[in-house]
């Protein structure tokens, strides 16, 4: 299956209610927009979310495609924290690298920790965690979607 849905999403910590602190009401509109975005995406039932983050791994003149088994991160604000852990779609990540190469784009698979298993886990930045907080675990699904993280070249 190809691309079934595409969107741009904000990534300010205050849109997650637990991290909003005194800004809960001020970010209500943005939070509501993210909830609507998640609902719209869920209607298309993607099995994997490909997320391009401006705040993750920074590679000079190279696109990075995360090939770890997992990605996880913790975000702290106003004395509180949230944590997320997702399984990565390694097969799709390899396909993206292959297609990029065929298109003469420089893309590398990047791993962290171990080559496989629970310790094969890329640290998750806030530009990934915050959108996935809303998009990655729709209310009606029993399991989280898989993800592929892509980092732009610098």
Feature-to-residue mapping (PLM):
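Internal, conserved structured core segments that host functional sites
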Residues: 94-154
